[in-house]
Amino acid sequence: MQDGDPSVHGETAAFKNAGRQRSYRGTTMVTTLSPCWFCSGLIRQFGISRVVIGEAQTFYGGHDWLAENGVEVVLLDDPECIEMMTRFIAEQPEIWFEDIGQD
């Protein structure tokens, strides 16, 4: 969650920062976590071809759905990403649960 806006995730911020493009096909998006359903929809809507995911242990988002719908998904399950997110969740549970839309 960036700028105090729970809809601004890393994926949406990257997409916005990329600006208007003729096409996003052939684009690789790199994420720390498995994209949530909101971000997964963005990826599919604009035809992003490949997603590289740092880890999907702390949050299991829509990456299976993306793969089932033709997006190449590379799941690293990187220990550094897992540790970073585990620490963040422990230190900032209120922000984490707001970000993922859970009570």
Regions found by a protein language model. Give the residues of each.
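Acidic/histidine-enriched, glycine/proline-rich intrinsically disordered or flexible terminal extensions
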Residues: 81-103
